Amino acid sequence: MRGFGAEELLNCYARGVFPMAEGRDDPRIYLLDPDERGIIPLDQFHASRSLRKTVRQDVYQVTINQDFEAVVAGCAQSAPGREETWINESIIRLYSQLHDAGYAHSVECWSGADLVGGLYGVSLGAAFFGESMFSLRRDASKVALVHLIARLRAGGYSLLDTQFTTEHLESFGARTISRSDYRERLAEALIFEADFSALPDEITGAQALQSITQTS
């Protein structure tokens, strides 16, 4: 998509539209505006007892924005149950530009020096648009999601957009809403300015869980 850069991508998010590609080897980007959208209400996020235990034990070291490109690359790799990826070179270039401009963020899970999971997304106003996640070790992406929710709650976000819903996301409280409902929520979220860095760059699992359970 010639002439389509970071500024144009942000404008798409502000209109409720998001990009996707057919496959990794297809350089084209399509803009989607589905009839229904997936969200995780931040005050209704659910983490199972076993996941809370894993988070509290700090099985992984969790960081933010330490290796954005590696997280995107991890999300672009094929995995069991995800043989095809929609992340092509154009997507990687665009989101790297957004990251350099301070709008795209990553959450990384490390085991020693190895990146074993993480997620990335876009922050605009008080809305966070989750793009993709990956996991090479048990529960790594789930731990990253818990830490993301903690940051969004602490930073004053009001909308977590998951684009679509899956059974996996529904287990965390994700639900589907209509396009009109989504646009109303988005318009309200864009009025305010949230802070992705409201918490320190590295927090413990116990601190993340405390942030999630605090009354807003």
From Swiss-Prot:
Known EC number: 2.3.2.6
GO BP: any one term: protein catabolic process
GO cellular component labels: cytoplasm
Reaction equations catalysed: N-terminal L-lysyl-[protein] + L-leucyl-tRNA(Leu) = N-terminal L-leucyl-L-lysyl-[protein] + tRNA(Leu) + H(+); N-terminal L-arginyl-[protein] + L-leucyl-tRNA(Leu) = N-terminal L-leucyl-L-arginyl-[protein] + tRNA(Leu) + H(+); L-phenylalanyl-tRNA(Phe) + an N-terminal L-alpha-aminoacyl-[protein] = an N-terminal L-phenylalanyl-L-alpha-aminoacyl-[protein] + tRNA(Phe)
Main location: cytoplasm
Keyword list, A-Z: Acyltransferase, Cytoplasm, Transferase
Keyword presence, Nucleotide-binding: no
Pfam families reported in the protein's UniProt record: Leu_Phe_trans
Molecular function in Gene Ontology: leucyl-tRNA--protein transferase activity
Protein location: Cytoplasm
InterPro entries: Acyl_CoA_acyltransferase, Leu/Phe-tRNA_Trfase, Leu/Phe-tRNA_Trfase_C
Entry keyword annotation includes Acyltransferase: yes
Top EC group: transferase
Similarity comment: family membership: Belongs to the L/F-transferase family.
Function: Functions in the N-end rule pathway of protein degradation where it conjugates Leu, Phe and, less efficiently, Met from aminoacyl-tRNAs to the N-termini of proteins containing an N-terminal arginine or lysine.
NCBIfam families reported for this sequence: aat
Protein name in UniProt: Leucyl/phenylalanyl-tRNA--protein transferase
Species of provenance: Maricaulis maris (strain MCS10) (Caulobacter maris)
Biological classification of the source: Bacteria, Pseudomonadati, Pseudomonadota, Alphaproteobacteria, Maricaulales
Gene: aat
